[in-house]
Every structure is written in structure tokens, then in C-alpha cells.
């Protein structure tokens, strides 16, 4: 029979960050992601919704370089490359990285580690826009909501982005989960579920501030 694990959320009364009260080893919960022998299909509907917002940002600032953390097979970045941006991917899956490189996307096989940050800074310097989103139909092991050390993660993000640059991220919102009883959004891959205050405090700890926040329908 299949192995089962308890699941529950622990909510911080101070900042509103919710995290799993029982964590399962990442090699178990992300086994499917790394065992796929074909490119994981990007969520194209999600991607189309993102593009207009990025274009408005690009028009108001000088955006030349875009870095995607957990870039999957690179198809989402390929659209930005066609628009003239320099695009870079960080992707822990060897298979996904190879697919991405075959599409012409310069992709580093790694999680968002200090070593990966040093390599990117050495090769490209800081970037204008960092994307942290899940472009695949299964939870991504390199997404901010799925990592154990949030402080290290956001510190690495802050090192990658230029002083006048931007970090775009989409995270599970604990407010909607609690208000509407969205228990099917809680599973072992997602270790953290964020409130506005928790994101604000987390990024303020590394000198970043929220420029805008929106509640998405998906």
C-alpha cells in the first residue's frame, strides 16, 4: 500500500505565515517531478495572464535581463526571448534543463543556492527582473513556497536583482485558504502559505519592499 503522511498547518499569530506542521523529505514528495521523462507542460493560460503585467513593467523601467527561478523546460522564457529580452533560467532537473537549452535558453542546473547566485553574478551580473512562479502543472521544488529555508532563499533573490529591479512572485495565499476552506490547496509539496504581512516582513529583512500585490483567481 502507498505510504501515508500526516498533514496540518501551523499558523504564526504575529505575521500570518502558515507552514506544514509535518514535513516529508523532498526526495519523496518531488519524486514525480524528477522522474518525468518528458517535458512538463507549462500552464499557458497562466503565462498569458502574466505577459501583460510584465510588459507594463518593462515600459515603465529599463528591463533587459530576466531570470526565472524554477524555469522548467524554458518555454515560458522563450516567449520573452522572442520579445528581445536576455533570459536566464535556474532549473534543478537535468532533463528540464536540457530541454530548455535546446530551445536556446541559457539555463543553470541548480536550485537557488549561494553557489548558483555567484555563478550567475559572475557571468551576467545582476538582472532587471526575477520571476518566481510555477510554470508547470506539478509543484516545483525550486519555488519559494516549497523550500525549507525562506531567509536564505530571499537573500539570494535580493543579491540577484538590481537596486532598481523587481522580483515577481506568485505564492499560495493563506487568507483565501482559510476564508474559503480550500483544503485541497494544502499538500506536502507546499511547505509555506503566505499572508501579505509575512511576505512584506520576509522581503524587508533583505532590503526589498512590495511595489504592488494582487489576489489572483488561480
Go through the PLM ranges and name each one.
Residues 208-217:
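Conserved S-adenosyl-L-methionine
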Residues 66, 130, 167:
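Receiver (REC) domain switch-region micro-motif
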Residues 169-192, 196-198:
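Short, glycine-/aromatic-enriched active-site segment of Class I SAM-dependent methyltransferases
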Residues 3-99, 108:
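Extended interfacial segments that mediate partner engagement and assembly in macromolecular machines
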Residues 127-149:
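A short SAM/SAH-binding and catalytic strip from SAM-dependent methyltransferases
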Residues 104-119:
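Conserved SAM-binding strand-loop segment of SAM-dependent methyltransferases
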Residues 118-130:
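A short acidic, Gly/Pro-enriched loop at the edge of an enzyme's catalytic core
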Residues 151-166:
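A short glycine-rich, Lys/Arg-flanked "PGG" loop and its adjoining helix->strand segment in the class I
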Amino acid at each position: 500500500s502507498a505510504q501515508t503522511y500526516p498533514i496540518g498547518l501551523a499558523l504564526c499569530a504575529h505575521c500570518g505565515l502558515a507552514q506544514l506542521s509535518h514535513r516529508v523529505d523532498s526526495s519523496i514528495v518531488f519524486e514525480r517531478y524528477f522522474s518525468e521523462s518528458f517535458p512538463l507542460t507549462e500552464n499557458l493560460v497562466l503565462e498569458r495572464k502574466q505577459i501583460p503585467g510584465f510588459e507594463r513593467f518593462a515600459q515603465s523601467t529599463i528591463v533587459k535581463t530576466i531570470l526565472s527561478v524554477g524555469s522548467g523546460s524554458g518555454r515560458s522564457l522563450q516567449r520573452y526571448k522572442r520579445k528581445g529580452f536576455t533570459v536566464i533560467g535556474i532549473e534543478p532537473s537535468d532533463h528540464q534543463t536540457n530541454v530548455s537549452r535546446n530551445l536556446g535558453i541559457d539555463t543553470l542546473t541548480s536550485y537557488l543556492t549561494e553557489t548558483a547566485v555567484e555563478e550567475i553574478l559572475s557571468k551576467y551580473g545582476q538582472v532587471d527582473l526575477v520571476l518566481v512562479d510555477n510554470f508547470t502543472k506539478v509543484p516545483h521544488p525550486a519555488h519559494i513556497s516549497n523550500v525549507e529555508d525562506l531567509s536564505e532563499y530571499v537573500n539570494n533573490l535580493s543579491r540577484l536583482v538590481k537596486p532598481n529591479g523587481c522580483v515577481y512572485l506568485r505564492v499560495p495565499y493563506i487568507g483565501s485558504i482559510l476564508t474559503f476552506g480550500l483544503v485541497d490547496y494544502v499538500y506536502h509539496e507546499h511547505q509555506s502559505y503566505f499572508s501579505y504581512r509575512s511576505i512584506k516582513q520576509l522581503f524587508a529583512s533583505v532590503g526589498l519592499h512590495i511595489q504592488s500585490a494582487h489576489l489572483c483567481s488561480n
